[in-house]
Amino acid sequence: MIEIPTDLPAELVPLSWLIGVWEGTGVLDYAIGDDHTEREFGQRIGFSHDGQNYLAYSSTAWLLDSDRTPLAAESGYWRLSRTLIEGDAGPGMLPGVGPRPFGTAQSVEALRASHGGFDIDVSIVHPNGVSELYIGRVNGPRIDLATDAVVRTAGAKEYTAATRLYGLVENHLLWAWDIAALGQELRTHASARLAKAE
C-alpha cells in the first residue's frame, strides 16, 4: 500500500510511491568483448523530500562478499518536468517570488502528458566524475528514463548513454539499468529487487 505523507507538495504525488528507504540485492551483468562481469550486490536507496518540488535521491551499493566491498554510489534529484516560473526558487540560492506554483492536485493535473502520466527530469551525480541528466515519464508505479545528456570529467571512464526502468511490483522496488560505456553500445548492465526498509 502506498502512503502519501501529509506534508508532501502536490507536485510530488506522482512520485510519492518512491519515498522511503529501500534495501535489497541485485545482479551486475556486463560484457565487454570476451570479458564478462557477473556479480551479485547489495543496495540501499533513499528518496526523501524537504517540502520543495523535488525528491532527493541517494544510493549506495556493495558487493556481496565477506568484506561488503563498496561498489558504487550516486545521488541526485527527481522532479516533474515543467518550466520553472517566478514562484520557484533559483537559480542558485535566489528565493521564489510570489506564490508557489502547482500547489493543488487540480493544478498538477495540468502537467499530465498525452501518454497519461507525467514527464520527469532526473539528475544523478556519481563520485567517479560522471553526471547524468535523464528525461522520462512516470505513469502510475512505473518510471522510464533515458539520458538526455552525460557529462564527464577529463579523467572519467567512457560513458555515453543510459536507460533506467523502475517499477513497484508486489510492494518491491524493481529496477533495471542499461548503459553504453567503454566502447559498447547500450546494453544490460544491472538490475535489483528492493524491499522498503524505512
Swiss-Prot record:
GO MF annotation list: heme binding; metal ion binding; peroxynitrite isomerase activity
Leader sequence residues: none
Listed Gene3D superfamilies: 2.40.128.20
Pfam families: THAP4_heme-bd
Keyword check for Nucleotide-binding: no
Domain of life of the organism encoding this protein: Bacteria
Motif GXWXGXG: positions: 20-26
Cofactor(s) needed: heme b
Keywords: Heme, Iron, Isomerase, Metal-binding
Binding site for heme b: H189
Enzyme class, UniProt record, top EC level: isomerase
Cofactor comment text: Binds 1 heme b group per subunit, that coordinates a highly solvent-exposed Fe(III) atom.
InterPro entries xref list: Calycin (IPR012674), Nb(III)_bact/plant (IPR022939), Nitrobindin (IPR045165), THAP4-like_heme-bd (IPR014878)
EC number from the UniProt entry: 5.99.-.-
Reaction it catalyzes: peroxynitrite = nitrate
SUPFAM superfamilies found in the cross-reference section: Lipocalins
Pathway: Nitrogen metabolism
Function: Heme-binding protein able to scavenge peroxynitrite and to protect free L-tyrosine against peroxynitrite-mediated nitration, by acting as a peroxynitrite isomerase that converts peroxynitrite to nitrate. Therefore, this protein likely plays a role in peroxynitrite sensing and in the detoxification of reactive nitrogen and oxygen species (RNS and ROS, respectively). Is able to bind nitric oxide (NO) in vitro, but may act as a sensor of peroxynitrite levels in vivo.
HAMAP family noted in UniProt: nitrobindin
Family membership: Belongs to the nitrobindin family.
Summary of subunit composition and partner proteins: Homodimer.
Entry's free-text remark on domains: Forms a 10-stranded antiparallel beta-barrel structure able to accommodate a hydrophobic ligand in its interior. In fact, this fold hosts the heme group, which is located in a wide surface cleft.
Name of protein: Peroxynitrite isomerase
